[in-house]
Amino acid sequence: MEVIEGKMPFMGYETYYRIVGRRSEKTPLVLLHGGPGSSHNYFEVLDKLAEIDNRRIIMYDQLGCGKSSIPDDHPELYTKETWVKELMALREHLALRKIHLLGQSWGGMLALIYMCDYHPVGIQSLILSSTLSSASLWSKELHRMIKYLPIEEQAAIHRAELTSNFNDPDYLKANEHFMNQHAIDMTKTWPECVMRKKCGGIVAYETAWGPNEYTPEGNLHDYEYTEKLGKIKIPTLITSGTDDLCTPYVAKTMQDHLAGSKWQLFENCGHMSFVEKTDEYVEMLRKWLDQHD
């Protein structure tokens, strides 16, 4: 399978991108990774879609992580505005006039910000993978799920939030347990690209989001896009897992505000259903993309 790697100049730094598959008449799919700061790595499980569907897939590392520049000495760069500009620059750099756009977790937030605030042209369809339209609802739902943890783990998380001490061993153990339950269970063996150690991303995550998934106190703390979703008029597919950080309530809230959208719920999956049920996810994407080219 053909893979092209490159770097794009951006704001005096460099953005790494990876293109999978040969050029064809089909509209390419651009993938926006989560975090902020998670890097493209886990998206490599979707490489097979390029071959199966004869469609180019483009993924990249957002500024602050992976193989892109990591200007952690300038955390003021880690904002939604920077990352939207980077996406726009990548489209121009690679001449991506028409695309399908998939965003996972924070990547879905980035896609919604891009769609609602910048009104881009040439987006054939939108795939919102385990994402959110409201930071406050997300936090509320995750705190509800924390109540299902053992009492001592609940107490450790509560204590960390009260004291802002997120280095306490009891908190770290409780948070790891929570994330293994609802993000992805890292005690299991996954494809190499999922297990691969990430470069950077911590400063970007803590600056933009916060110390963990359920305490959004970074510059995205006021991310509230539910009431803006009506601006999106293109075909939209929402995907999530039954055990996801993106709870069914979070996913249904988005669907209710996106006219004509579809929602695919993956049974027994957490925050990365495309990793846990790759073949099923790829087939769903193939059908969706072919329908909306």
Curated annotation (Swiss-Prot):
ATP-binding among keywords: no
GO CC annotation, single: membrane
Protein task: Releases the N-terminal proline from various substrates.
UniProt-annotated location(s): Cell envelope
Tree of life domain: Bacteria
Family, similarity comment: Belongs to the peptidase S33 family.
Keyword Nuclease appears in the UniProt entry: no
Protein keywords: Aminopeptidase, Hydrolase, Protease
Pfam families recorded: Abhydrolase_1
Coiled coil regions in record: none
Protein name: Proline iminopeptidase
Reaction(s) this enzyme catalyzes, per UniProt: Release of N-terminal proline from a peptide
MF GO annotations: aminopeptidase activity
Sequence ranges assigned to domain AB hydrolase-1 in this UniProt record: 28-277
Phylogenetic classification of the source organism: Bacteria, Bacillati, Bacillota, Bacilli, Lactobacillales
GO BP: any one term: proteolysis
Signal peptide per UniProt: none
Active site annotation, chain numbering: S105, D244, H271
Entry EC number(s): 3.4.11.5
